[in-house]
């Protein structure tokens, strides 16, 4: 929390208190099947340093000088330093998989209120949190979600995973089931797996479930 106090001999009249988030803003894009991480700094004369191995950055780590490019799963942590001291930080976890850079074809549109970042959000490697309005979840209203992903070539897959959110107080529920179909020509499909949801429809809280 934040505490504010005024030290003075008499009565103080306060009209407005404003607080600003000085944390660096991190955004990601998919480039050539890999990731590009962009960092925006709001601290004057601050210096952004980052790591890709999950460590908290220190004053000796790599200086951010432009988009950070890589093509593997990584936890990107960045911090703004000034005078050798870390003043603010941010992080993002990116997961590499075979559908990176392959936006799905959807039979039903996603909600304009919950785009998750656009057409490639379902396969961009960024996981949503437990908060439905964090900007990373893509929402579908009433219609079933059916997504077809063209990997560009025949690929041997061992696992297909999808993450879903339930928050009954916000009228968000997990799917009743998750089915996976495969095709070699994009025309003839056969079922290769299915998972039924076992979470009660009335279970409250912010639930993130992975179906595989």
Where are these regions (language model features)?
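Noncatalytic modules at the cell exterior or secretory-pathway interfaces
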Residues: 1-2, 212
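Residue-level detector of beta-strand face positions
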Residues: 3, 49, 77-79, 148, ...
